[in-house]
């Protein structure tokens, strides 16, 4: 494969991995530990 194709595939995989990790953190098991500032300061 050409170098440009390998670089493009690597960057794409990195972005997909980061997006997957962000979704897991936001909606998966670790989301229970996140604080909600709107719930802390109810009026």
Curated annotation (Swiss-Prot):
The gene is psbN. Coiled coil: none annotated. The chain crosses the membrane at residues 5-27. It is found in: Plastid, Chloroplast thylakoid membrane. This is Protein PsbN. It comes from the Eukaryota. The keyword Chloroplast applies. May play a role in photosystem I and II biogenesis. GO terms for cellular component: chloroplast thylakoid membrane. Pfam families: PsbN. Belongs to the PsbN family. The keyword Disulfide bond does not apply. Disulfide bonds: none annotated. One of its GO terms (biological process) is photosynthesis. Keywords: Chloroplast, Membrane, Plastid, Thylakoid, Transmembrane, Transmembrane helix. It is a single-pass membrane protein.
């Amino acid at each position: 494969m050409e170098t440009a194709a390998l670089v493009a595939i690597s960057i794409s995989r990195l972005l997909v991995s980061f997006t997957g990790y962000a979704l897991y953190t936001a909606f998966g098991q670790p989301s229970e530990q996140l604080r909600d500032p709107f719930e802390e300061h109810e009026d």
